[in-house]
Regions:
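Short, exposed beta-strand/loop patches in secreted or surface proteins that constitute
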Residues: 79-83, 198-203, 221-223
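A short, sequence-level motif marking secondary-structure junctions
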Residues: 97-103, 133-139, 218-222, 243-249
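N-terminal recruitment modules of adaptor/scaffold proteins
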Residues: 127-128, 132-214, 237-239, 260
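Phosphoinositide-dependent membrane-docking surfaces
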Residues: 88, 94-110, 208-229
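Eukaryotic low-complexity, acidic/Ser/Thr/Pro-rich regulatory regions of large signaling scaffolds
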Residues: 230-270
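Alpha-helical transmembrane spans
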Residues: 13-79, 186-193
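Membrane-interface amphipathic/juxtamembrane segments adjacent to transmembrane helices
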Residues: 78-93
Length: 270
């Protein structure tokens, strides 16, 4: 049963679909076959054998069928994703945003900095699963993060202000990507152990801790700009810099907003 208001439906991006090399090859073959069919038809008017035309027609139908199979395959591989107030539906499964663990592989190629290749997520108490981003527009990730943040930000702020700590495991993207990008469903479950033993960023109402290095809000500037987390002293000397484009951070958008929120909250005495 579907609950709450439907906010957005993300569908397959067919422009990405038709940019796939094998689809381009198929299109070229279809184009060549059309030319062949046209040429043979013209030659038929001059008295050529009917079998040539029949062969061309059969090839044309075969290419059309192959094109249909490709479309069917990609439609099933990249199903619609429905976003509601409290959850999203992917492959008929309802996944709640609250306490959802996730991270994503960034596409660091030139001109692709706003792209992502995969989202790996684990519902509260569930198993790790993945969404292949190659068949969707970047809008999918924007909606995903916005919905997640709306459901978890206020709760995280309240926890920190009450004396609690929000913890964000992080790891080198290359390590995680090489190990899990093509993993089976069973292999993905190792991610839980990987992140339990990974370095962690901890946010409290007094400070941010980067793998046991503590920086309090009052004496340091802590910024999370696009692609980089920077810690600097009050004289603007950089103390620590983490390039997030090469790092996977669990619940990265939540970490970014918490850092922005608490860094502004505390006055700096230069």
């Amino acid at each position: 049963m579907k609950e709450g208001k439907l906010k957005k439906i993300i569908k397959i991006d067919w422009t990405i679909f038709y940019s796939k090399p094998r689809i381009q090859i198929l299109g070229i073959l279809i184009f060549l076959d059309i030319i062949l069919l046209f040429s043979v038809t013209k030659e038929m008017e001059k008295g050529f054998n009917v079998s040539s035309v029949s062969t061309s027609i059969v090839l044309f139908i075969l290419f059309i069928l192959l094109n249909g199979l490709f479309i069917f395959y990609y439609k099933n591989k990249f199903p619609n994703i429905e976003f509601y107030d409290d959850y999203f539906i992917f492959k008929k499964e309802k996944v709640y945003y609250e306490n959802l663990k996730y991270f994503f592989f960034k596409d660091n190629r030139l001109f692709q900095m706003k792209k992502f290749s995969k989202i790996l997520y684990r519902p509260d108490g569930g198993n790790w699963k993945k969404i292949d981003g190659s068949g969707y527009d970047y809008d999918l990730f924007s909606v995903f993060q916005k919905c997640f943040l709306e459901k978890n930000f206020s709760k995280a702020v309240k926890n920190i202000e009450s004396g609690g700590v929000e913890i964000f495991p992080f790891q080198n993207q290359g390590f995680v990507k090489n190990k899990f990008l093509f993993s089976s469903q069973e292999g993905l479950q190792e991610l839980t152990q990987i992140f339990e033993s990974s370095p962690k960023i901890q946010v409290s109402n007094k400070s941010v801790t980067f793998d046991n290095e503590i920086y309090d809000w009052e004496n340091y500037n802590i910024e999370f700009e696009i692609g980089t987390i920077t810690v600097s002293d009050l004289k603007q000397n950089t103390i620590l810099e983490i390039e997030t484009k090469n790092t996977v951070i669990c619940q990265e958008i939540l970490l970014k907003n918490l850092i922005e929120n608490f860094d502004k909250k505390y006055p700096k005495f230069y």
